[in-house]
Structure formats: structure tokens, C-alpha cells
């Protein structure tokens, strides 16, 4: 699992499929450049100032990184870019609920792509 760090990668993902849950907004796009690297998916994390100050934004991103590390190796599809956008509930939702939100968003996005999660 690689990280998205460049702005154009985030903008491309924003033009893809978007699924909103109480704690997470998931943006997914297929990336043809990753086809040459089998088994690779990329993930990025964002938290805007609507979440709160720097401490709250950093905490939200840490929670998103932990959720992605737990879920994406099992449910993510290679060849896709995933961007997890923090919402206000990211900070207060129990971690199990955060994981459930991510799994449901992934399943919905993959169904929309025509590549359901196994």
C-alpha cells in the first residue's frame, strides 16, 4: 500500500467515485498507471479546517490511517487510488464504527466500479 502525496493525485481521485458515511468520505478512482505494478493500491488522507484545529486534524488523520491499515489490505482492490476525507464524526465515532463505515463505503464504491469486493 503506497501513499498519495501529490496534489494532482488527490484531484484525480476527487473526480472519481465518492461515497459518504457518517465518519468518512471515501473517494476512489481507477489508476491505469498502477496496472504495471500488480497488487499495488495507493491511499491518501485529508482533514480540512472544518474538523478543527491542527491537533484535531492530526488526530483524525491518525485514526484514518489506522482504519486504512486494518481494512485496505483485505478489502482494497489493486490498481485503485483511495482518498479518505475526515468528517466531524471521525473524531468521536468508536473505532469499530469507523472500520464499519470504511468497509461499507469500500463495498459501495467497488460495486459502482463493477468490481465487487470478494
List the model feature ranges, each with a label.
Residues 1-118:
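Positively charged, solvent-exposed patches that mediate nucleic-acid binding
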Amino acid at each position: 500500500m503506497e501513499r498519495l502525496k501529490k496534489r494532482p493525485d488527490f484531484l484525480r481521485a476527487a473526480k472519481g467515485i465518492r461515497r459518504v458515511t457518517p465518519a468518512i468520505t471515501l473517494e476512489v478512482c481507477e489508476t491505469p498507471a498502477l496496472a504495471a505494478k500488480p497488487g499495488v493500491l495507493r491511499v491518501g488522507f485529508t482533514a480540512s479546517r472544518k474538523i478543527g484545529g491542527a491537533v484535531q486534524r492530526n488526530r483524525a488523520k491518525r485514526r484514518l490511517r489506522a482504519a486504512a491499515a486494518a481494512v485496505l489490505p483485505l478489502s482494497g482492490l489493486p490498481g485503485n487510488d483511495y482518498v479518505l476525507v475526515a468528517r466531524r464524526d471521525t473524531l468521536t465515532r468508536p473505532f469499530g464504527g469507523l472500520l464499519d463505515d470504511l468497509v461499507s463505503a469500500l463495498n459501495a464504491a467497488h460495486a459502482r466500479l463493477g468490481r465487487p469486493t470478494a
